Amino acid sequence: MGLKIIYGRAGTGKSTFCINQIKKKINNSPTNKLILIVPEQFTFQTENKVLNAIGERYVLNAEVLSFKRLAHNVFNECGGATRTIMGDAGKSMLIFKVLEDLGDNMTVFKNASRQKGFIDIASKTITEFKKYNVNNEVLDLTINEIEDENLKMKMEELKDVFNEFNSRLHEGYVDEEDQLLLLNEKLDGCSLYDGAEIWIDEFSSFTPNQLSVIGKLLKRAKSVNITLSIDEVNSPKGESDLFVATKNTEKRLMNLIQEEGIAFNGYINLNEDISYRFKENKELAHIERQLYAYPFKQYRGKNNSLRLYRANNNYDEIEFVAKDILRLVREKQYRFKDISVICRDVDNYEKVVSAIFAEYEIPYYIDKKIDIASNPLIVFINSAVDIISKNWTYESMFKYLKTGLIKEFRGIEGAELIDELENYVLAYGIKGKKWMEEWVNYSSSILKEEEISEEDKQRLERLNDIRENIVTPLDEFNKQCKGKKTLKEFATILYEFLDSKLDVMDTIDKYVDYFKENDMAIEAKEYYEVRDIFIDVLEQAVDVLGNEVMDLNEFMKVLNIGLSQYEMGLIPVALDQVNIGDITRIKSRGTKALYIIGVNDGVLPSASKEEGILSDNDREILLEKGISLASDTRTKIFEEQFLVYTAFTIAEEYLVVTYPLADFEGKSQRPSIIVHRLKKILPNVKEESEGFKLVDDKYEKISAKLPTLNELMIAIRKNYDGAEIEDYWKYVYDWYLREPKWKERIEYVRKGLEYTNLENNISKEKAKKLYEDNKNKISLSVSRLERYAQCPFAYYIQYGLKAKDRKIYEFTAPDLGSFMHEILDEFTNEIKEKDLKWSDLSKENCRNIINSLVDNQVKNNKSSILNSSKRYSYFTDRFKRILTKSVMVISEQMKRSDFEIYKNELAFGFSKDVNSIKLDLPSGESFYLNGRIDRVDKLNLDGETYLRIIDYKTGSKKFDLNKFYNGLQMQLLVYLDALINNSENIVENQAMPGAILYFRIDDPILKSKGDLTEEEIKSEVLKELKLEGLLLDDVKVVKAMDNTLEPGTHSLIIPANMKKAGDLGKNKALITMEQFELLRKYVNEKMVEICQNMIEGKIDIEPCKENKNIVCDYCNYSHICQFDSSLEDNRYKVIPKKKDEDIWKSINEKVGGEVNGD
């Protein structure tokens, strides 16, 4: 009976010493038990190491245990296993309920207890109390002595939570910390380990409970040997001493044996021998000794074992690591299992490491736990509850359906059904009660109901069948979950819903079988483990809180809190693979080569300073009062220092330290102080970078097949551009050509070099087939011609190939335009029927008629989007205000005008009144233009008839002569030309152009420095909604448009002003009759030019660019054309900024005439 301490710095062979002693004992045929105790996370690795060192005899004669396994053995042998051990899930769920029940009586934690994450913090504090033997009695004594009021209140509330938790827990359970307390009790009367020889390895400190267990073992065992990582024993220590934590542990152990009267069998100093791990490596031995030595010594010998690499970013960093690993394996005969990669936060590096290592064909295992929240089963459960608690939203429904756990929707066919369903749901705004109703709408308009075809009826019938299959079990689940129930009842309902109603558990079994058959071990493990975790959490919840009454949302909170405590460990899929992990989890286990990545300031060592519920100051006060708890943040800084020291002493032969200059988000980063320290203690080490590498490897770019192919592509590109490349690339190229798997890819590379996204013209025959209607005519609108002028390729995709966007149930700008136009047209018809004149309309008339028209429109179309929600009801009221304001302005404009409204919604190409505009092309084909004019006004003056076209717009628009010249704004001139050409049929005599104007439909917000009178408001509104466009430069005609226009004034309703002399002021909106004629000629020639290009199959990727306005910014097809202005062949069609007089001159030159823009 006695304690022996085996000590030495990192790499001195402490673990190997223990294993060798066990091996020696086994060789001598021991009669007593041989036990090696290590931390829980190292049991598997240690078992492997012992098995490799000793062989099968180890299994019969020795055991590798953790304290947890030790307790399990004692309870099984000597009793104590009567109460179930509660896992972290049950513990967290119980704490949640305790906090809920105590919440209103709390002061300090009342608000915090409802915050996400507080349960974990509270759980850690309870665990800490138990680890450090803080019980109710200790808390009472300490609280009475605390003078700090805030800490006193905090401790009183913590005591209440602690006591309530223990009271409920001990009704039938113990937690893991109680295990050690129970183990202490049981060891007193248990002879299981009497006479055993015990080694305790890999611990830097022990909790009070663990120390108590060690004390009990010391009394019963033949010997207890404990390893400690220390430079020297019985030496003075300061808090900055690298080994302060282990020296404190040594002190506690010595105090323990003195108090218990146990013999001390002395020290074994492994520092006296040559470092076991670094005996063949001077540089690594020097790092171990001098990394934290003050003052330090320098090593000026040759450096072969340490590399420092400064990476541009994380991708460059990991690619360097991958290439170097392959170099070690190929040239130095390393095995992948001899290599480890470690960092401070493996989560940050997981994705980039996985991607690059896969590319370089490096087998690897990431030693980390993964969150189960994204597993399909957990998503399925949460989204099922979200569906019924959040009113059947689109997001929750399709999360639920896309998990793949409903058997009807598995596989490709199931996915296609979901896609079809999703398209309908998005197009028709299905949510809430609409899921419970039969779907009958299949109209293309979101504002009006339409007749549907037989084909669409069949689609609807199929969709309704799918809907029924989805809704029926969910609706039943919803009804069962109404109101408050016990947690046990909710658990039963949920499990029956999953297992009996939907066969989800059976579906998971099928997935597991499929994954196993296809060598997908990780996926198979995830699916069956998460299912078992869910069942376990459900059972724990029932055991702990089964009789608690709650509603569905509270039940899901409890369940998710339990599930959140579980993380799933990944399993190694091969024996020979690179080990990747956090520095806190990876220990030296035959690691010949080590890569420490992400060695940046604030990252390694970590700068994290989370205090938890108890601050550093609180802990100091409690320590003064006799309560010793876990480390404060200051102590953790020095513990982090020891962690770094441990990490840098893992490698046996080769160490690589890397850091990126920028993080994953592109933010700059500095190297860690460790990098500077390494440069000081090893002055001969040279820092490498992408442009400077010490390892002379002219074949560095030849690595794994895929990255080598990428490098080959770059080399081929250089050669294609005339640059010199290394000779070996032709042999690499030949190798890929000989390999069937890669030959096709090489061909793609070659084609890629010749690739251009420029499109060849399609044939005239193909263009006709694409653009002709079912009557073999090419009929189109002016807006489509303008679209072609913007970009021929976009037109080809939209109107030739008939590409369509996914239909979404939303009110878009075109929908708004259609709605406003329709109401204005109905308004005009209404006042005609009532024999009212525009000029006689009052504000009340306007409001009443508009309200009635809008209400009828919405009422008569039940499926209209304006009936779908309160939000759209608000929009409807807003539309009423806008339309009312607009018709009032139109009324005022008509009062001030001698022009009269002749017709609304005048169609050409759709009626007998106005024929389509026929465009005869030079090549012999004909195009037919159809359109609809919002409003035509007429004026009879001095025996002549003048026509004025008004185009309603929901946004601001002015006539731009430059856009017109380039075919981007032709519509009003085309309409005018059609009217003038057909005027004898329309107005029964030849008419002349009076104006083409835009009217903005709006209820403008007025800006003013002070209050305005009613008259001033009226004037400001008229100014804001002034008609914009071109007017005939004739004072009589202009005066007829605004009969209030007087000499020396500006019109409030049209873009014109009158000089004091009575003639019109200079204004680019005023053009002569000859100029109107010129524009009409030009627009016809421009349309013919556009149509000729269209029929000839020109589909150039040539988007227009005017100043900063680029057509591509609003194009839905940019991902198809892949236009890139940086490519040599990709060019914008630039619309240069020109003066109006220069444009008039160009128009003159194109169509003839002597009219200028002056």
Curated annotation (Swiss-Prot):
Q: Which residues participate in ATP binding?
A: 8-15
| Gene Ontology MF term list | 4 iron, 4 sulfur cluster binding; 5'-3' exonuclease activity; ATP binding; double-stranded DNA binding; helicase activity; metal ion binding
Tell me its EC number(s), please: 3.1.-.-
The source's domain of life comes to Bacteria
Where along this sequence does the record place binding of [4Fe-4S] cluster? 791, 1112, 1115, 1121
Name the Gene Ontology biological process terms. Answer: double-strand break repair via homologous recombination
Supply the InterPro entries for this chain. ADDB_N (IPR049035), DNA_helicase_suAddB (IPR014140), P-loop_NTPase (IPR027417), PDDEXK-like_dom_sf (IPR011604), PDDEXK_AddAB-type (IPR038726), Restrct_endonuc-II-like (IPR011335)
Pfam families the UniProt entry points to = ADDB_N, PDDEXK_1
The note describing how and how many cofactors are bound reads: Binds 1 [4Fe-4S] cluster.
In the record, which residues are listed under signal peptide? none
Q: What keywords sit in the KW lines?
A: 4Fe-4S, ATP-binding, DNA damage, DNA repair, DNA-binding, Exonuclease, Helicase, Hydrolase, Iron, Iron-sulfur, Metal-binding, Nuclease, Nucleotide-binding
Co-factor requirement: Mg(2+); [4Fe-4S] cluster
What Gene3D superfamilies does the record tag this protein with?
3.90.320.10, 6.10.140.1030, P-loop containing nucleotide triphosphate hydrolases
Q: How does it assemble?
A: Heterodimer of AddA and AddB.
Which PANTHER family did the record assign? RECBCD ENZYME SUBUNIT RECC
Cite the HAMAP family for this sequence: AddB_type1 (MF_01452)
According to its UniProt record, which protein family does this protein belong to?
A: Belongs to the helicase family. AddB/RexB type 1 subfamily.
Which function does this protein serve?
The heterodimer acts as both an ATP-dependent DNA helicase and an ATP-dependent, dual-direction single-stranded exonuclease. Recognizes the chi site generating a DNA molecule suitable for the initiation of homologous recombination. The AddB subunit has 5' -> 3' nuclease activity but not helicase activity.
Q: What else is known?
A: Despite having conserved helicase domains, this subunit does not have helicase activity.
Designated name of the protein: ATP-dependent helicase/deoxyribonuclease subunit B
